[in-house]
A protein has these predicted regions:
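Serine-centered coil/turn micro-motif
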Residues: 71-72, 113
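Helix-adjacent hinge/juxtasegments
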Residues: 73-107
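Short Pro/Gly-enriched beta-strand edge/turn motifs at strand-loop
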Residues: 35-41, 121-124
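Charged, gly/pro-rich active-site loop segments
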Residues: 1-21, 97-167
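Short beta-strand segments in beta-sandwich/barrel cores
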Residues: 40, 64, 83, 106-107, ...
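Short beta-strand segments
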Residues: 37-70, 85-89, 98-100
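Short, basic/aromatic recognition patches
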Residues: 19-39
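Charged, amphipathic alpha-helical segments
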Residues: 23-27, 70, 123-125
């Protein structure tokens, strides 16, 4: 493909006419979906290096929270705070698509800080148990910047199946 062809493909959804769902209704639907799941794919990267990690998450205070022992995702996190999360259902045909891509900013929470301990409590993990781990468990916090939502069911109500939320 030429550069222009890549650009045209990349801009496909930007240039497509959209029938937007009212923002509050969209946010409510998205929150319900996020809350009904607990696993995402976390994409991190820097330079030529890219990593996509399946990981459990919690969502509260408008952010995604993930405990992690470590792993190669931290190669990207060290140098690049920009991340992407994907939450999705099993593919069962184009009429049943349900997924969210979340672009956001990641930060590592200081172990045993008030924020860290608060999240441990929400996850029902005793802080004393976490203190016994060496090294301590890492806590990744992702603040959403943009969510791209693809729910086929939106079409039934006259909206485009693809919706965007900017933060």
């Amino acid at each position: 493909m030429t550069h222009d062809q890549f650009k045209k493909a990349a801009d496909y959804w930007k240039n497509k006419k959209q029938n937007a769902m009212p923002e509050e209704k969209l946010k409510k639907t998205v929150l319900e979906y996020i809350s009904s799941n607990n696993t995402c794919a976390l994409a991190t990267g820097t330079g030529d290096y890219v990593r996509c990690t399946p990981i459990e998450y919690s969502y509260h205070d408008g952010k995604f929270w993930m405990f992690s022992e470590g792993g190669e995702k931290f190669i990207g996190l060290e140098k690049n705070e920009n991340v992407c999360l994907a939450i999705y259902d099993k593919y069962e045909g184009t009429g049943n698509l349900k997924s969210i891509q979340i672009m956001g900013k990641a930060e590592l929470v200081e172990p045993f800080s008030d924020t860290y301990n608060k999240h441990a409590k929400i996850k029902k993990i005793p802080v004393e148990a976490l203190k016994k781990l060496a090294p301590p468990m890492n806590l990744i916090c992702v603040t959403p910047v943009k969510m791209e939502v693809l729910f086929s069911e939106f079409k039934k109500n006259g909206y485009s199946s693809r919706q965007t939320i900017e933060f």
